[in-house]
Amino acid sequence: MLAACMGMTLLAGCDSEQQKTFNEAVKDLEQGSYEYALDEFTQSVNNGISLAVSYRGIGICQMRLGNYEDAISAFTSALSSDKVSKTMAKDLYLYRATARLQAGLLDDAMADCQTLAQKYEMDADCWFLSGKVALAMDGYDEASSDFEQAYGEDSCYDRAIQIYETYLEKDMEADGTRYLEAALSSEAKDTDDMCDRGRIYCYMEDYGNAKTELTNASSKGSTEAVLRLGMVYGAQ
């Protein structure tokens, strides 16, 4: 009986350590410590702890470290795991499509985007990614339609900048500039908005208005605005 109790205590201790490793992995991922998180999530997979979440964590770490093929493999393993909710599956398809895009596997990335469109409710992130993949495949009309859907659902400054930068990478700056102009039609609500407006004016090489926005933000205590002001002066 004593031996059995000791065995159960040791097993409980092992379970506790394994859960601690998993919790540390989640924490390290949130903090951007990708190499530590990768090692810990790998241990969690070996320990059979929250397999879908652990594989997802491995995939994100590998993607952030530039190891796109390994990231794709991890996201695929996560999708094949038991007890994957519909919400998590949608998230995993988004991540895998992104990794496939980064790896240059455009047909595979588009296949994931099509799965998202067929099986899940499309949101701004889905539409944006689908547009980005379409543009990489020179599907200009499809990309334009997807970006319009994305901005229609999330007309924030960051989204406008994302779309602009995607077009800029394809030397199609004019197509992206209209999103910057649309974003500027709204009023800034806080210092973050002022910083974003400053960034947009910089993209448009309107440094006078960029200074105005960033100066206003810095006067309200935004350290980001101070840094960006220095960049504006350096760009002139």
Show the residue positions of the predicted features.
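Start-of-helix register in tetratricopeptide repeats
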Residues: 19-20, 53, 60, 87-91, ...
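Short coil turns that delineate tetratricopeptide repeat
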Residues: 49, 83, 87, 121, ...
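Canonical tetratricopeptide repeat
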Residues: 57, 64, 88-95, 129, ...
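Register position in tetratricopeptide repeats
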Residues: 30-31, 64, 102-103, 136-137, ...
